[in-house]
UniProtKB/Swiss-Prot annotation:
The modification Phosphoserine is found at S331, S334, S335, S338, S341, S352, S361, S374. Pfam families: Ndr (PF03096). It comes from the Eukaryota. This is Protein NDRG3. The keyword Ligase does not apply. Residues 364-375 have a biased composition (Basic and acidic residues). Residues 347-361 have a biased composition (Polar residues).
C-alpha cells in the first residue's frame, strides 16, 4: 500500500548573506501584466516562455510579502536554473500588494480568500495557459489549495509551504483583533512568518523583512489582505477512506508537496493539513534547522525537493541531484512513508537500510515508517 512521506532535510548554506538582502528581490527578464477579473485587477509577472503543453509554475505569496520578497531569492538561486529552463514562471501578486501599488479607494471591499482563488482562472485564460504547478506560501498556499479544489483540471501539482487549511477560530480572531489595537502590523506579520527563536537569532534576516514590510508594502492594502486571510473559511478537506470512491472525498487530487521548517510557527497547521490529505499523492517535507521562510534561507534543499517532485510527475527526468551528491556525508534522521509522489520515489532510491513500520488504523490511508536519509 502507498504510504505517507515525512522527510527532514538539512541545509547549511544561508541565502541571505548580505545585510539588506535586496539583490535577492530583483526580477530578471520578466514581463508584467495587469489583468482585469470579476473581483478586481490582479498583477502578474511572467518569467520565460511557456514550453509547449507543459504547465507553468504559478506562485502566490504570503501576507506582508509580494512575489519579489517571497520567491525571487528562490528562483534566482543558481540550482533553480535547471528547473526554470524547462518551465515558464507566473508570479501572482495579491491585489494591492505589488511593489508601488496605490491605496484602494475608501470603502473598497477587498476580495475574500475564495474570491482571490477565483481570480486565477481569468489570469490563465488571459495568458493562454492550460495548467499550472502551483507554489504557495501561507496565505498563497491557502489560495492555491482552494483553486485546486474548485478547478482540479487546471492544477497538475502543488507545493504548499506553511499552509493552514483551517478557519481562524473565534478565540484566535478576537486575539488578533485585540493585538491589532496594541501591536504594530509589521510585528504581527513578522510573528506570522517567524518563530521566537528565529526572531531573536536571525537578526539580519528579520531586519531585511521588517524594512520590506514597513517600507515596500502599502500598509493600508496590507491591512485589507491580512483581514481577508484572517476571515478565511476552513478548506474542509478530508482524507479518503480505504475502499471509498475518491470522488466522494473533498481533497486535493493532484500531487502535493507540503513544506515547513521545523521551527516555523506553521508546523502544527501543516501537520493538520497533512492528516487531511490523501497519502497516495502527498509528501510532507519537514526541513531541519529551518524557520518560517524555507524558500529564502534554505533554497538548496527546497530546490532539490522540487526537482524530485517534478521528476515524479514525469518532468525533467535527467535533472541531476548535485547538491544531494555533494552533501551525502551529512546524515539526518527522517520519518518517511513511501508514497507514489515525486519526492518519495526519488528519496527511496537513495536509502541504504531497512525500515521500521508502525501500526495504524487499517481503514485510513495513513501508515508511517522510519528511514535514514543521507543528504
Amino acid at each position: 500500500m502507498d504510504e505517507l512521506q515525512d522527510v527532514q532535510l538539512t541545509e547549511i548554506k544561508p541565502l541571505l548573506n548580505d545585510k539588506n538582502g535586496t539583490r535577492n528581490f530583483q526580477d530578471f527578464d520578466c514581463q508584467e501584466h495587469d489583468i482585469e477579473t470579476a473581483h478586481g485587477m490582479v498583477h502578474v509577472t511572467i518569467r520565460g516562455l511557456p514550453k509547449g503543453n507543459r504547465p507553468v509554475i504559478l506562485t502566490y505569496h504570503d501576507i506582508g510579502l509580494n512575489h519579489k520578497s517571497c520567491f525571487n531569492a528562490f528562483f534566482n538561486f543558481e540550482d533553480m536554473q535547471e528547473i526554470t529552463q524547462h518551465f515558464a514562471v507566473c508570479h501572482v501578486d495579491a491585489p494591492g500588494q505589488q511593489e508601488g501599488a496605490p491605496s484602494f479607494p475608501t470603502g473598497y471591499q477587498y476580495p475574500t480568500m475564495d474570491e482571490l482563488a477565483e481570480m486565477l482562472p481569468p489570469v490563465l485564460t488571459h495568458l493562454n495557459l492550460k495548467s499550472i504547478i502551483g507554489i504557495g506560501v501561507g496565505a498563497g498556499a491557502y489560495i492555491l489549495s482552494r483553486f485546486a479544489l474548485n478547478h482540479p483540471e487546471l492544477v497538475e501539482g502543488l507545493v504548499l509551504i506553511n499552509v493552514d487549511p483551517c478557519a481562524k477560530g473565534w478565540i484566535d480572531w478576537a486575539a488578533s483583533k485585540l493585538s491589532g489595537l496594541t501591536t504594530n502590523v509589521v510585528d504581527i506579520i513578522l510573528s506570522h512568518h517567524f518563530g521566537q527563536e528565529e526572531l531573536q537569532a536571525n537578526l539580519d534576516l528579520i531586519q531585511t523583512y521588517r524594512l520590506h514590510i514597513a517600507q515596500d508594502i502599502n500598509q493600508e492594502n496590507l491591512q485589507l489582505f491580512l483581514g481577508s486571510y484572517n476571515g478565511r473559511k476552513d478548506l474542509e478537506i478530508e482524507r479518503p477512506i480505504l475502499g471509498q470512491n475518491d470522488n466522494k472525498s473533498k481533497t486535493l487530487k493532484c500531487s502535493t508537496l507540503l513544506v515547513v521548517g521545523d521551527s516555523s510557527p506553521a508546523v502544527e497547521a501543516v501537520v493538520e493539513c497533512n492528516s487531511r490529505l490523501n497519502p497516495v499523492n502527498t509528501t510532507l517535507l519537514k526541513m531541519a534547522d529551518c524557520g518560517g521562510l524555507p524558500q529564502v534561507v534554505q533554497p538548496g534543499k527546497l530546490t532539490e525537493a522540487f526537482k524530485y517532485f517534478l521528476q515524479g510527475m514525469g518532468y525533467i527526468p535527467s535533472a541531476s541531484m548535485t547538491r544531494l551528491a555533494r552533501s551525502r556525508t551529512h546524515s539526518t534522521s527522517s520519518s518517511i512513508g513511501s508514497g507514489e509522489s515525486a519526492f518519495s520515489r526519488s528519496v527511496a532510491s537513495n536509502q541504504s537500510d531497512g525500515t521500521q513500520e508502525s501500526s495504524e488504523s487499517p481503514d485510513v490511508l495513513d501508515r508511517h515508517q522510519t528511514m535514514e536519509v543521507s543528504c
